[in-house]
Regions:
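Divalent metal-dependent phosphate-bond-processing catalytic cores, especially two-metal-ion Mg2+/Mn2+ enzymes
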Residues: 29-30, 34-173
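An active-site-proximal "capping" alpha-helix that borders the catalytic cofactor pocket
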Residues: 1-7
Length: 173
């Protein structure tokens, strides 16, 4: 696998090869395994953050219809489930298995911001502007919009805080 991507991969030490392979293999796991070493977790987090930033770009550039199979109007007419809202209030990644409405699918992607643990990644997300574009939402029902504003505020506060506490981003921090 890696030898196809990284030239001279065979010249990297066996330990470094193992770390890189684990990082690539686990970077998209909802929760990182407890069995990873600190070094392996660090590499996973680097790849995860790059991937999350790319997901924001892909959603904006590809459009909602392509990504979600429904249009903006359908998403903005739907509800926000308590399970997805709770992820925002806990400042954690949303469990994709708990998405139940069109809005949940979009908000679960916005919640990826809680996986941006490094200041550099949060700064880059703000500089790129894709996440802010994803968060420009006005839900059709006032009670849903009110709930969304609280979620959006939580995400914006997270992105602009200087220091992250241990455990931010979920159980895999």
């Amino acid at each position: 696998m890696a030898e196809d991507i990284i030239p001279n991969f065979d010249r990297i030490s066996a330990e470094d090869q193992r770390v890189l392979e684990k990082a690539v293999y686990h970077h998209s796991d909802y929760r990182l395994p407890d069995t990873l070493t600190e070094r392996e977790k660090t590499f996973c987090k680097i790849i995860r953050e790059a991937d999350q930033l790319d997901i924001f770009r892909t959603i904006v550039e590809s459009g909602w219809e392509t990504i979600y199979g429904c249009g903006r109007e359908e998403i903005l007419a739907s509800e926000i489930s308590d399970a997805i809202a709770e992820a925002f209030f806990r400042r954690q990644l949303a469990d994709y298995a708990k998405r139940s409405t069109p809005a949940d699918y979009h908000l679960a992607h916005i919640a990826l911001c809680f996986g941006l643990e490094s200041k550099a990644a949060r700064k880059r997300a703000l500089e790129q502007g894709y996440l802010q574009q994803m968060m420009e939402l006005t839900f059709l029902r006032p009670e849903v919009q009110e709930k969304y504003i609280r979620l959006k505020t939580e995400a914006e506060n997270y992105l602009t805080e200087e220091e992250k506490t241990e455990g931010a981003g979920g159980a895999d921090s």
